[in-house]
Amino acid sequence: MSCDGGKPAPAKLGDEQLAELREIFRSFDQNKDGSLTELELGSLLRSLGLKPSQDQLDTLIQKADRNNNGLVEFSEFVALVEPDLVKCPYTDDQLKAIFRMFDRDGNGYITAAELAHSMAKLGHALTAEELTGMIKEADRDGDGCIDFQEFVQAITSAAFDNAWG
């Protein structure tokens, strides 16, 4: 979901992106029938760090299921996610600049203290509970800090959540 610093995103997914999507799709297609059930689609989205509610999942399936069979085939899956994958809310340069703003000591990681300080500076003071929740949600490897990849994933998840309601 990375963008080439400042260049506009392409209108279509490239071959490499399609191959990655196909691999992801196949790994969640439990019975290998070429389609995803609601449960399989939910698992796939959660593996990407997203947390769709049941209503969001129902809406996604209704939107994707063009042949009305209650399942999501690969072509339907691509049609569903392609618009969000080809548009990038931030360029790589913007993401790096935002990350550097939060990573006050420049060590490549955002700690809870750095996050709290930066959010307070932005006028969004966090409670201890909010801070813990944000770190826990973004910290994929469990080391207590947020590295750049985890930061990008968190931003991407937030953008997806905003786009999908």
From Swiss-Prot:
Presence of keyword Calcium: yes
Annotated InterPro entries: Ca-binding_regulatory, EF-hand-dom_pair, EF_Hand_1_Ca_BS, EF_hand_dom
Chain ranges of the EF-hand domain: 16-51, 52-87, 90-125, 126-161
Top-level taxon of origin: Eukaryota
One Gene Ontology term from the biological process aspect of the record: regulation of monoatomic ion transport
GO cellular component, one term: plant-type vacuole
GO MF term (any one): calcium ion binding
Keywords carried by this UniProt record: Calcium, Metal-binding, Repeat, Vacuole
Residue sites binding Ca(2+) 2 per the record: D65, N67, N69, E76
Record SMART domains: EFh (SM00054)
Gene3D superfamilies: EF-hand (1.10.238.10)
Residues annotated for Ca(2+) 4 binding in this entry: D139, D141, D143, C145, E150
Residues binding Ca(2+) 3, per UniProt: D103, D105, N107, Y109, E114
Location in or out of the cell: Vacuole
Residues annotated for Ca(2+) 1 binding in this entry: D29, N31, D33, S35, E40
PROSITE patterns: EF_HAND_1, EF_HAND_2
Pfam families xrefs: EF-hand_7
Keyword Repeat attached: yes
Location, primary (coarse class): other
PANTHER family, sorted: CALCIUM-BINDING PROTEIN 8-RELATED (PTHR46311), EF-HAND DOMAIN-CONTAINING PROTEIN (PTHR46311:SF5)
Primary role: Potential calcium sensor that modulates ion selectivity of NHX1.
Subunit structure: Calcium and pH-dependent interaction with NHX1 (increases when pH decreases, better at pH 5.5 than at pH 7.5). Also interacts with the CPB protein At2g18750.
Protein name as annotated: Probable calcium-binding protein CML18
Organism from which the protein derives: Arabidopsis thaliana (Mouse-ear cress)
